[in-house]
Amino acid sequence: MKTIGVLAFQGGVIEHVKKIEELGAKPQLVKKKEDLKDLDGLILPGGESTTIGKFLIETGLKDQILNLIYEGMPVWGTCAGAILLSKNIKNQGSGVLPVLNIVIERNAYGSQLDSFKKEVFVPRFNIATECIFIRAPRIVEVAEGVEVLAELETPIAVLQKNILATTFHPELTSQNYWHSFFVENMVK
């Protein structure tokens, strides 16, 4: 059985756990370094990226997670998780886990009040998926080697080797396409 870690600090932790269970995988809440042991993949949920970044540094999780990513462990960042993984945050430097060759802009769609839901066609799935954007970032540039999986004017889902990033919250929908893609296609 595959074991998928979910960083349990902020965001839709419980919602991610439920999606993982629906797919027959075992969720593992990650709050400390020891929780990273024996994971097959890791999800970095949304929340506030600066606060999550401080948590990763203070707990020592940052270096451990980076090592696992460099070793090839699949990782998926949703919303703030995508910001954490970005090599370049527009006008702000890089994310705490700078492994994804994109430029991302924080809160690009506005405040909490500007949150929205949209159906977006995903060629890889050959279906439209529901996407929920809450204070979402916008991917403004992708480097060579980064595959754009879905777009809404600009990329909203990208894949670079073992790194998946979505600027929206798939865990808040009734669908399970993105979790299925991560668990069944990326996690070995």
Curated annotation (Swiss-Prot):
Name of a matching Pfam family: SNO
InterPro entries attached to this UniProt entry: Class_I_gatase-like, PdxT/SNO, PdxT/SNO_CS
Gene: pdxT
Family stated for the protein in its record: Belongs to the glutaminase PdxT/SNO family.
Purpose: Catalyzes the hydrolysis of glutamine to glutamate and ammonia as part of the biosynthesis of pyridoxal 5'-phosphate. The resulting ammonia molecule is channeled to the active site of PdxS.
GO biological process: glutamine catabolic process; pyridoxal phosphate biosynthetic process; pyridoxine metabolic process
Enzyme Commission number, as recorded: 4.3.3.6, 3.5.1.2
Positions annotated as active site in the UniProt record: 79 (nucleophile), 169 (charge relay system), 171 (charge relay system)
Keywords tagged on the record: Glutamine amidotransferase, Hydrolase, Lyase, Pyridoxal phosphate
Listed name of the protein: Pyridoxal 5'-phosphate synthase subunit PdxT
Quaternary assembly: In the presence of PdxS, forms a dodecamer of heterodimers. Only shows activity in the heterodimer.
SUPFAM superfamilies cross-referenced by the UniProt entry: Class I glutamine amidotransferase-like
Gene Ontology molecular function: glutaminase activity; pyridoxal 5'-phosphate synthase (glutamine hydrolysing) activity
Catalysed conversion reaction: aldehydo-D-ribose 5-phosphate + D-glyceraldehyde 3-phosphate + L-glutamine = pyridoxal 5'-phosphate + L-glutamate + phosphate + 3 H2O + H(+); L-glutamine + H2O = L-glutamate + NH4(+)
Lineage: Bacteria, Bacillati, Bacillota, Bacillota incertae sedis, Caldicellulosiruptorales
